[in-house]
């Protein structure tokens, strides 16, 4: 096994928020594979993240980001449980990353898939159900195919489904869970507004 570089440990720590020794151990266990190390850390820490997801998050920050060229601006509210966490630079940096992610994702309109209005999903369902390749399929298989296609078509609109700009191997939903584990309290991306010059 090759030596684990300090740079790799630093990258993993920035992504996951886990401690330096935990990152180093996870990288050793995964023979330096960053994706496998993230999975290892998730397995160790995300059980607590899932429990914490039900706690009320009323503290937090509102962060602004103006993209290069001054043509796109984003305001995002990211909540946590305590003002102690809200004041931490790591939390503010996470919120700034989310604002940058939104600015860099031109089609993102919703935080989670469940935030998409029912009428948009129904419209997609009608379009997909009229496709020729589904006409001779059994109804139960047809419904599963339609659901899969709707999910695929609409995932570009959902922030949680976007690959994280700093590490394409994880999406924003996974990043939020990793941050819940790191800060040891619930974290929520509550809302955002994107301004595009001329729109």
From Swiss-Prot:
Q: Which UniProt keywords apply?
A: Chloroplast, Elongation factor, Plastid, Protein biosynthesis
What top-level branch of life does the organism fall under?
A: Eukaryota
Q: Name one GO molecular function term.
A: translation elongation factor activity
Predominant cellular place of this UniProt entry's protein: plastid
Where located? Plastid, Chloroplast
Alphabetized PROSITE patterns for the sequence: EF_TS_1, EF_TS_2
Fetch the SUPFAM superfamilies from UniProt.
Answer: Elongation factor Ts (EF-Ts), dimerisation domain (SSF54713), UBA-like (SSF46934)
Instruction: Name the Gene3D superfamilies on file.
Output: 1.10.286.20, DNA helicase RuvA subunit, C-terminal domain, Elongation factor Ts, dimerisation domain
List, alphabetically, the Pfam families matched: EF_TS
Which cellular components does GO assign to this protein? chloroplast; mitochondrion
Q: Which NCBIfam families match?
A: tsf
Identify its protein family: Belongs to the EF-Ts family.
Role according to the record = Associates with the EF-Tu.GDP complex and induces the exchange of GDP to GTP. It remains bound to the aminoacyl-tRNA.EF-Tu.GTP complex up to the GTP hydrolysis stage on the ribosome.
Q: What is this protein called?
A: Elongation factor Ts, chloroplastic
UniProt source species: Galdieria sulphuraria (Red alga)
């Amino acid at each position: 096994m090759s030596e684990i570089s300090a740079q790799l440990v630093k990258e993993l720590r920035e992504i996951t928020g886990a401690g330096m020794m935990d990152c180093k151990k996870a990288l050793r266990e995964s023979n330096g594979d960053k994706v496998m190390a993230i999975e290892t850390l998730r397995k160790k820490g995300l059980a607590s993240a899932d429990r914490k997801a039900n706690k009320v998050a009323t503290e937090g920050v509102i962060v602004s980001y103006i993209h290069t060229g001054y043509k796109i601006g984003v305001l995002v509210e990211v909540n946590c449980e305590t003002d102690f966490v809200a004041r931490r630079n790591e939390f503010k940096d996470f919120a700034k990353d989310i604002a940058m992610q939104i600015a860099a994702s031109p089609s993102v309109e919703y935080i989670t898939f469940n935030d998409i209005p029912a009428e948009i999903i129904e419209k997609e369902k009608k379009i997909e159900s009229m496709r020729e390749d589904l006409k001779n399929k059994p109804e139960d298989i047809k419904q599963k195919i339609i659901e899969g296609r709707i999910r695929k078509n609409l995932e570009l609109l959902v922030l949680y489904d976007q690959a994280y700009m700093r590490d394409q191997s994880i999406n924003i939903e996974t990043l939020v869970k990793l941050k819940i584990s790191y800060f040891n309290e619930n974290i929520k991306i509550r809302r955002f507004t994107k301004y595009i010059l001329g729109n």
